Amino acid sequence: MALDPLGAVVLQSIMALSGRLALAALRLWGPGGGRRPISLCVGASGGFGGGGSSEKKFSLQDVAELLRTRACSRVVVMVGAGISTPSGIPDFRSPGSGLYSNLQQYDIPYPEAIFELGFFFHNPKPFFMLAKELYPGHYRPNVTHYFLRLLHDKELLLRLYTQNIDGLERASGIPASKLVEAHGTFVTATCTVCRRSFPGEDIWADVMADRVPRCPVCTGVVKPDIVFFGEQLPARFLLHMADFALADLLLILGTSLEVEPFASLSEAVQKSVPRLLINRDLVGPFVLSPRRKDVVQLGDVVHGVERLVDLLGWTQELLDLMQRERGKLDGQDR
């Protein structure tokens, strides 16, 4: 039976993506980023898709127009740590931070060891100290999270792929069905011995009390479903690879695009699909393999998002949404 045209495109894209991901083992190599923004449009002469320099370069205004007119309505978003730092989330890898100093009492060989299973089984306390700091509820979503929520509310968001484990996408009101949490979540937890699954709130009291949570059945350590080095990515990461074949716009915000296989997804959309990077630095394919419809907004991520929102004419809607949602979060804290 022949595939319809859209089905053929999806199949071809999945096959191409699978080939690229086969080169990057489906293992997590590590957990996943001002000045005023500078707008940079990558021209046709150096990009995929050919064409001469006379072709019109794509701009942030063009991206805004596609969204405003709903010419693009299947938006896939990729985000990293850079969207959460404005919420005040500390970097445990940065010397001088209180969290880094607190973790040093455990004689950690290097910060990333916290996410290594061997070290975790030897001494799980450093991870749970970090978990206590990052557990949902400690930090609030910022402008960028609520912009993504607004995309969902306007039925423009196909899927949001996040490297973050802070849960701020959920806290902004984006439903779980729209999320692929590539590096895991605190929403669920699993016993490392008997593999029983638990709701994340079941271990919350232990984590907040600086106790290592234990399975009530076998007494094994119960670990939040955060992806450690060498662990398989969540099944949803694979189930939604077709999203990139269906996408008509790709937004990439606040990520270094260094961690595979997440980083390879940035090249998984069709070559005709616009890609917008809002980031502190020029990264990944925007350096190595730019395309004609690439747009780069360099600088502070929040400032870049605010500029896009202004071009969209959504500023007041975003402010109203933030006020409503922050009021709800304040009510939950009482």
Curated annotation (Swiss-Prot):
Name assigned to this protein: NAD-dependent protein deacetylase sirtuin-3
Organism: Mus musculus
Known role: NAD-dependent protein deacetylase. Activates or deactivates mitochondrial target proteins by deacetylating key lysine residues. Known targets include ACSS1, IDH, GDH, PDHA1, SOD2, LCAD, SDHA, MRPL12 and the ATP synthase subunit ATP5PO. Contributes to the regulation of the cellular energy metabolism. Important for regulating tissue-specific ATP levels. In response to metabolic stress, deacetylates transcription factor FOXO3 and recruits FOXO3 and mitochondrial RNA polymerase POLRMT to mtDNA to promote mtDNA transcription.
Free-text comment on the cofactor: Binds 1 zinc ion per subunit.
Enzyme class of the recorded protein, top EC level: transferase
Description of how the protein assembles with itself and partners: Upon metabolic stress, forms a complex composed of FOXO3, SIRT3 and mitochondrial RNA polymerase POLRMT; the complex is recruited to mtDNA in a SIRT3-dependent manner. Also forms a complex composed of FOXO3, SIRT3, TFAM and POLRMT. Interacts with NDUFA9, ACSS1, IDH2 and GDH. Interacts with PCCA.
Tissue expression notes: Expressed in cardiomyocytes (at protein level). Expressed in the brain, liver, kidney and testes. Expressed in skeletal muscles (at protein level).
PTM sites of type N6-succinyllysine: 57
Record field: catalytic activity: N(6)-acetyl-L-lysyl-[protein] + NAD(+) + H2O = 2''-O-acetyl-ADP-D-ribose + nicotinamide + L-lysyl-[protein]; N(6)-[(S)-lactoyl]-L-lysyl-[protein] + NAD(+) + H2O = 2''-O-(S)-lactoyl-ADP-D-ribose + nicotinamide + L-lysyl-[protein]
Cofactor names: Zn(2+)
One cellular-component annotation, GO: mitochondrion
Gene: Sirt3
EC code: 2.3.1.286, 2.3.1.-
Keywords for the protein's UniProt record, in alphabetical order: Cytoplasm, Metal-binding, Mitochondrion, NAD, Transferase, Transit peptide, Zinc
Recorded family membership: Belongs to the sirtuin family. Class I subfamily.
Source species, domain of life: Eukaryota
